[in-house]
């Protein structure tokens, strides 16, 4: 007899997914491969679409954002959408990356997103991303991930800097350049990258390469209630929404799984939530099915989107940073996020819709608002709604140390979101 899938099982699968997703390009490639294995058909934005009833499709943009959708056999009335993002704060490797400085060779990097910089010090790091190369006279894309510790960003010993444990302003160009090797004793960095990608260094025309932490994810705690890992924001939600999307029985609605890039730097890119990617996808698939423009706009107005991006749990050592009343806790359930400043898309209707969905299936929810003297951040829902408006709830899973290189969340919460998304698509 087949054993039921437990929250622990789901978290182990999440850790595996994160380990296989060192860059946004790898995350999208992995999800696309899983969808193709499940019978989805890949379509391209540059081609004319021929969407069929009963079909399952996946399309990518820039190799770092993805839309997947399923079409019912009859009577699609609206779209049911989940949106999450696959990027996380990190360091991007600049062009001409090597800096020889005395006896050492460092890599020239710049910050991507609002990270807790000190958490990147003294960690085993490596490099992942994509290369654009010439291959048989044409441009070709190659993904690369160095499977081994390649770099460390060393901290300064306390004997040399007595202020190291005081609040400190970290400068990327001075403090955060990763150590690559000793002058004259290392293979050039781009030669190592080329060898890993099985191309010649002289054939590399451009690259999108980032650093990633090689510290593995783990499940821990007296009752194995915690999960700690790099990139929980937002691969935890991306994974849970994907699993719910593939599990839910899809009838009546066109079900859409949206995975965006560049949320951590504002989403205002061609592959971000502020782009036309979602709007173009919905309109093109509806028009291909024979819906008029007016019918398509009516479908969108009847639709609903769950924007899933992780939320802040109340901190065990610093509860004063949380709202006095709305204080999510790890393993307390899915967090519904509110903002009077409209940093989140949640309103009374969308909150009630999502609460009822969860209540009907015994899935716990919590509420989050920022401390009134702390403006907080924004996320996908309100940004996407400026391009394609529909009722949207901004939700997330409670976590600690958001934007650290190693974050902590709850084992039960991932399972709660899988369950909620599955029921949403049903």
Task: Label each region the model flagged.
Residues 1-426:
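N-terminal hydrophobic/helix-forming segments and targeting peptides
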């Amino acid at each position: 007899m087949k054993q039921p899938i437990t929250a622990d099982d789901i978290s182990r699968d999440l850790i595996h997914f994160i380990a296989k997703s060192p860059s946004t390009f790898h995350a999208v490639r992995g999800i696309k491969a899983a969808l193709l294995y499940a019978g989805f058909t890949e379509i391209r934005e540059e081609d004319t679409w021929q969407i069929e009833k009963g079909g399952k499709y996946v399309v990518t943009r820039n190799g770092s954002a993805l839309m997947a959708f399923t079409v019912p056999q009859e009577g699609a009335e609206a779209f049911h959408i989940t949106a999450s993002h696959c990027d996380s704060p990190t360091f991007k490797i600049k062009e001409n990356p090597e800096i020889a400085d005395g006896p050492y060779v460092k890599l020239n990097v710049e910050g991507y997103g609002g990270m807790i910089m000190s958490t990147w010090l003294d960690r085993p790091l490596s490099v992942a991303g994509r290369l654009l190369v010439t291959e048989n006279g044409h441009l070709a894309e190659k993904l690369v991930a160095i499977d081994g510790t390649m770099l460390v960003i060393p901290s300064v010993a306390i004997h040399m800097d007595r202020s190291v444990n005081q609040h400190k302003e970290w400068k990327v160009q001075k403090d955060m350049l990763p150590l690559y090797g000793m002058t004259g004793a290392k293979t050039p960095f781009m030669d190592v990258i080329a060898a890993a990608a099985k191309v010649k260094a002289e054939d590399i025309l451009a690259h999108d390469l980032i650093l990633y932490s090689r510290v593995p994810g783990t499940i821990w705690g007296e009752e194995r209630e915690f999960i700690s890992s790099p990139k929980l924001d937002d691969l935890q939600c991306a994974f849970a929404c994907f699993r719910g999307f593939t599990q839910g029985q899809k009838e009546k609605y066109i079900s859409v799984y949206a995975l965006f890039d560049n949320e951590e730097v504002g989403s205002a890119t061609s592959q971000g939530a502020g782009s036309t990617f979602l709007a173009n996808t919905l309109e093109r698939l509806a028009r291909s099915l024979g819906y008029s423009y007016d019918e398509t706009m009516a479908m969108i107005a009847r639709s609903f989107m769950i924007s899933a991006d992780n939320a802040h749990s109340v901190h065990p050592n610093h509860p004063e940073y949380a709202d006095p009343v709305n204080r999510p806790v790890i393993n307390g359930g899915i967090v519904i996020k509110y903002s009077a400043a409209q940093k989140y898309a949640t309103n009374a209707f969308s909150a009630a819709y999502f609460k009822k969905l969860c209540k009907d299936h015994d899935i716990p929810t919590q509420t989050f608002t920022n401390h009134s003297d702390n403006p907080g951040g924004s996320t996908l829902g309100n940004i996407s709604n400026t391009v394609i408006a529909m009722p949207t709830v901004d939700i997330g899973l409670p976590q600690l140390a958001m934007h650290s290189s190693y974050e902590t969340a709850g084992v039960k919460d991932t399972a709660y979101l899988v369950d909620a998304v599955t029921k949403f698509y049903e």
